[in-house]
Amino acid sequence: MASINTIVKRKQYLWLGIVVVGTASAIGGALYLSDVDMSGNGETVAEQEPVPDMTGVVDTTFDDKVRQHATTEMQVTAAQMQKQYEEIRRELDVLNKQRGDDQRRIEKLGQDNAALAEQVKALGANPVTATGEPVPQMPASPPGPEGEPQPGNTPVSFPPQGSVAVPPPTAFYPGNGVTPPPQVTYQSVPVPNRIQRKVFTRNEGKQGPSLPYIPSGSFAKAMLIEGADANASVTGNESTVPMQLRITGLVEMPNSKTYDATGCFVGLEAWGDVSSERAIVRTRNISCLKDGKTIDMPIKGHVSFRGKNGIKGEVVMRNGKILGWAWGAGFVDGIGQGMERASQPAVGLGATAAYGAGDVLKMGIGGGASKAAQTLSDYYIKRAEQYHPVIPIGAGNEVTVVFQDGFQLKTVEEMALERTQSRAEEDNPESPVPVPPSAESHLNGFNTDQMLKQLGNLNPQQFMSGSQGGGNDGK
């Protein structure tokens, strides 16, 4: 059997010969066509069109499919530019509206300040109390002993305070001989065995999730960075193989919303389907590094290729060579059995066959070869049963990852905080609401049920005036 190097060398020589023959044919044809044009009747040769610049075109033919693709790209670019223009226009409208509101608010504040300044000037000229009444004069003091003058009749001088207005008093001392009105206070009596209410206020300082929610059905363009040979056997979905892709486009969400997840990695698992000749790929987790935040969480989704679920491939069976060896071993087994039977001498009815040394040697060779070939054939069959069909999927394929179930993007820190909070709630279950101690002390340590049980053992006749116990006491 020729080595792989010899086979490759022959192929290279074959291709070299094909290239040389093709080049020579092209040169000869060009020379022939040039001679035919020069031997013409002097007709003017039409000016040939310049060779189109095919730089950037992937395919060798510029057909309708490429033109349609270019048109689609231009339409998508125009739609994106129109969307950005509309967003900028809305932002400018909002800013103009806010500017007008701020201007009106400033004017209103200026008017309020002017009105307050006028009120302050009016209060400085005529001070009044909080109820709008003028400030009362101080009452006259009672006459002192031995005819001393009353302090209230003596003029009192105060130092000048400048233009500072004196604030009105908030309360007045009651006059002589006036009794202040009584004050009534109310105090609630706690009732036992009642449900207590507790109001929980929302923590306004707590912020919501810092990352968006990806709704179900969202999708993004991606590229496979790790291929695999998907197991296409009957139990292939139980023995999946890992794969990985890199998101290369924006995540398209409902209502033309997008999220930039470019560069994120998505872990995959795949198995093969012989009927459709496709590798069925499912997502496992997503990992990103966005603005210094680490995202690593499980997700549910699948991968599609050219509009269909799964990635197209060719089913490969690698047990053909082993099956050929098993067939060869079976063939040798048949030859050995034939040699063994041919070496047996044929005798008539009732006669006894005599075996010679040559017959024994032939039977041994045929039987040994048959047994060895049969064992080798069984071994190759068992080896072939271990092989299963696979669907090879190479890296570099452009695919689309689809998120089947919606999920909330969370950082590693947020997920750790949630686990800590859930663990704390499990360790500290909510306890029942206790009865306040003031209620027991107010009812001498008994609640309503206990008091009814104690009173149920009393006889009401003991508290009547004509009872027997009362007559005995009178004696």
Swiss-Prot record:
UniProt KW Lipid metabolism keyword: no
Keywords: Conjugation, Plasmid
Keyword flag Disulfide bond: no
Chain intervals with Pro residues compositional bias: 136-148
Transmembrane segments: none
Region ranges (Disordered): 126-180, 417-475
GO molecular function: ATP hydrolysis activity
Composition-biased stretches (Polar residues): 444-466
CDD domains on file: TraB
Composition bias type Basic and acidic residues, residue spans: 417-426
Domain of life: Bacteria
Entry similarity comment: Belongs to the TraB family.
Chain's role: Involved in F pilus assembly.
Protein name: Protein TraB
Species this protein is from: Escherichia coli (strain K12)
Gene name of the record: traB
